[in-house]
A protein has these predicted regions:
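Charged, amphipathic alpha-helical coiled-coil/dimerization segments
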Residues: 73-132
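N-terminal helix-turn-helix DNA-binding core of bacterial DNA-binding proteins
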Residues: 22-64
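Alpha-helical linker/hinge and terminal dimerization helices associated
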Residues: 10-13, 17, 21-24, 61, ...
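Generic structural concept
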Residues: 11-14, 41, 98, 132, ...
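C-terminal regulatory/oligomerization modules of transcriptional regulators
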Residues: 1, 125-146
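N-terminal leader segment of winged-helix/HTH proteins
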Residues: 1-31, 78
Length: 146
């Protein structure tokens, strides 16, 4: 029987999630897109009709400027994005998906569907709403830095 201490359960949950995300990421060909790169690809796809700048990705993912810079470099190296001059103001650089990035966004969708199905398949809407409220309170507690 697993430990019922909430902190121990969270640690176990995080470990198990990391393992499942890794396994399903490999199965769907998105092992390096299961984290921030994947979220950035989806954000770019959802905003293809707009100019998206590095600062927009930083804000959306709630990560620091240096982390965003490294993320952009990795994504460029992996061929998922290009950083090109803005069409409005050439001084600014916008981030656009490459054809590979667009194709991988579909794989990310399939991965997200699979992971959501595995996690939430036999949990009722009511249970999800209750757990959502509990997680919201936990997040609020963690975000309150005193």
């Amino acid at each position: 029987m697993r430990d019922k201490d909430p902190f121990s359960q969270f640690r176990y949950f995080i470990n198990l999630m990391e393992n499942r995300v890794h396994e399903l990421g490999e199965q769907h060909g998105v092992e390096n897109l299961a984290g921030p790169q994947g979220f950035a690809v989806l954000y770019l796809r959802e905003n293809e009709d707009k100019e998206v700048f590095i600062k927009d990705i930083e804000r959306k993912l709630k990560i620091s400027k240096s982390v965003t810079s490294n993320l952009i470099k990795r994504m460029e190296k992996n061929g998922f994005i290009e950083v090109v001059p803005s069409e409005v103001d050439k001084r600014y650089k916008r981030v656009v998906l490459t054809e590979l990035g667009k194709a991988k966004s579909k794989d990310i969708d399939a991965f997200h569907t699979a992971i959501h199905k595995q996690i939430f398949d036999d949990i009722s809407r009511e249970e999800l709403e209750i757990s959502g409220r509990v997680f919201d309170r936990i997040l609020k507690n963690l975000e309150n830095k005193e």
